[in-house]
Amino acid sequence: MASDSLLLTTTEDFQDQNDVTVGTIKCTAPIPFGGEEQWLYLPSTKKFDLSRGSQQKMILDCDVDDRHTGFMVDPGTSVLIVVDMQNYFVNPIYRHHAAGIAAVQPTLQVIERSRKEGIQIAWLNWGITEHDIKTMAPAIQRGFSKGLGWHVGLGAQLPGDQGRCLFKRTWNADLYDPFKAVALPGDLFFDKTRMSGLWSTKEPLHEYLRASGKQTLLFAGVNTDQCVFGTVSDAYSYGWDCILLKDCTGTMTGRGAQELTEYQVSTNMGFVTTSRAFCHAHISEPFEGY
């Protein structure tokens, strides 16, 4: 719901130097961004309020090139989306995904704090069927083609009882053990057949988010520049708040790809923060002046 129209209170300090007018205008009232579903920028704290009037706010501190000092969200309308933390992508029997493994412990800590604050956990994973193979676009199949990178081909039979590559309900498509150990019945599980889990309004995750009224999405998982970024990009385009937990993500593409994704998200699509900032976030009471 949009907040009431705000009159910006400003203080002005101008001076003339050699016929060149210079000075500053300082806003002291909240600055709205957006239409009916507004963010508020609070000049007094240099924080963005994404809570849309909620009485409970989770306040995260961060420093992004002096542009802001953090943001606050409503836990009740937030979802932690863990992308592709599956055996096929992270388990060492398939590849040495150092960045993915490094993201495991921070993500587990974020999951624990999310549960404490009532933030919904959603697992977004590749999970295809024979029908998907028959109707899949050529470019998607090529991305998993044998001989190109480390891919073996979507639907290919993997050794032993590992099942067909990224098919639903197979061991290789299952959650990596550290995550499987903490998944709970109240968690939500969504399959995807593209890099993005939000590419279509008919995607299960998309339908859930719209029906539930969830507004703020926190992202963890692999690979940062591929399936994570693909989903973030679509979430941004459809109007959800996007927060990337950078140490809870990882990619095999290289550090440059990670940094570029972080830059794109923080500059254009939302916010970038860390597991530490999230786990140390403060929960405000209604009377606190944020």
Regions found by a protein language model. Give the residues of each.
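Short, conserved acidic/polar surface loops in the N-terminal third of protein domains
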Residues: 92-94, 132-137, 176, 201-202
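A basic- and aromatic-enriched beta-loop-alpha substructure that forms the phosphate/nucleotide-
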Residues: 126-151
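Active-site-adjacent betaalpha module
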Residues: 2-79, 109-112, 116-117, 142-290
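A short alpha/beta connector and helix-capping loop motif
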Residues: 76, 93-126
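Short acidic, Gly/Ser-rich segments with clustered Asp/Glu that frequently serve as metal-coordination loops
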Residues: 86-92
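Asp-based phosphoryl-transfer active-site loop
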Residues: 79-86
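Short beta-strand segments at enzyme active-site cores
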Residues: 82, 119-132, 245
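Catalytic metal-binding/acid-base residues of hydrolase active sites
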Residues: 86, 127-129, 223, 249
